A protein has these predicted regions:
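Sec/Tat-exported extracytoplasmic proteins
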Residues: 52-66, 86, 90-94, 125-129, ...
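Structural recognition of the beta-strand scaffold that forms the well-ordered cores
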Residues: 77-81, 86-89, 131-136, 161-165, ...
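Non-catalytic pre-domain segments flanking phosphatase-related domains
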Residues: 2-80
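Surface-exposed, polar/charged faces of alpha-helical domains
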Residues: 64-71, 116, 120, 127, ...
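C-terminal cap/substrate-recognition subdomain and adjoining C-terminal extension
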Residues: 24-33, 40-46, 139-223
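Metal-dependent phosphoesterase signature
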Residues: 87-114
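Conserved phosphate-coordination/catalytic loops
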Residues: 46-49, 53, 108-116, 173-177
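Short, acidic loop-to-helix structural element flanking the phosphoryl-transfer center
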Residues: 105-133, 140-141, 145-146
Length: 223
């Protein structure tokens, strides 16, 4: 299977080529000033739109069986990260001036709003009989699991899904290692991961997905 990790600066680069002034995504972790400028300029939203348009196209391609070809084996599965992929911590973190760790605090203390592109993608996938799996680096414990499930539901993710959280036994592992292992376990269990979407490179590294799309996030880096 081919893996395509997509940078989401297409709109930015296209605009720059015709002399339009734009705010490019600053390298993470960026300063509070740079993060706000990127957000308030509207470019962050535009880059999200570009990424999710591609994600939708990739999903359609992955589910299309060409004439004369056999349907691929395995349960078609969509993988979504949660924080700043499915739910946005921006408003909450902004109130804390984006201090290091603020997004993580927000994730387990606030009901975060849905990122529309992700919610729409999830609804579309489920409608097409694709299994939805959230893989998050949020730590696995009863309290945080219940809080996360409630937040997802309140934000609009009411469809059937599986939530995979980081077990305490692998707490020292990087997010990349944990998430790669989680995807491989799904495949071993019969899944065919058609699309993987995340805001961190660690959400996508390790492959095991037919298509992968990376969203912009200048606020922090998870390895």
């Amino acid at each position: 299977m081919s893996l395509r990790v997509t940078a989401v600066l297409t709109a930015v680069l296209a605009a720059a080529s015709v002399g339009v002034a734009v705010a490019e995504e600053p390298a993470a972790p960026a300063s509070a000033t740079a993060i706000r400028a990127y957000h308030d300029s509207g470019e962050w939203a535009k880059d999200f739109t570009t990424a999710f348009k591609l994600a939708n196209k990739d999903l359609d391609k992955a589910l299309t069986v060409k004439k004369g070809k056999k349907k691929p084996k395995g349960t078609p599965t969509l993988i979504l990260d949660i924080d700043d992929t499915s739910l946005s911590s921006y408003d909450c973190a902004a109130k804390k001036d984006f201090i290091p760790g603020s997004n993580g605090i927000c994730a387990v203390t606030e009901n975060l709003p849905a990122i529309k592109g992700a919610l729409d993608l999830a609804k579309k996938a489920v409608k097409k009989k694709v299994k939805l799996v959230f893989i998050t680096a949020r730590p696995e414990n009863e309290t945080i699991r219940a809080f996360t499930e409630k937040n997802l539901k309140v934000a609009g993710y009411t469809m059937k899904h599986t939530l995979t959280m980081k077990p305490s036994g692998v707490a020292a592992e990087t997010s990349a290692a944990y998430k790669t292992a989680a995807r491989k376990a799904l495949i071993k269990g019969g899944a065919r991961i058609v699309l993987n979407v995340g805001d961190q490179q660690s959400d996508l590294s390790g492959g095991a997905a037919q298509y992968a799309v990376k969203l912009p996030n200048p606020m922090y880096v998870n390895k």
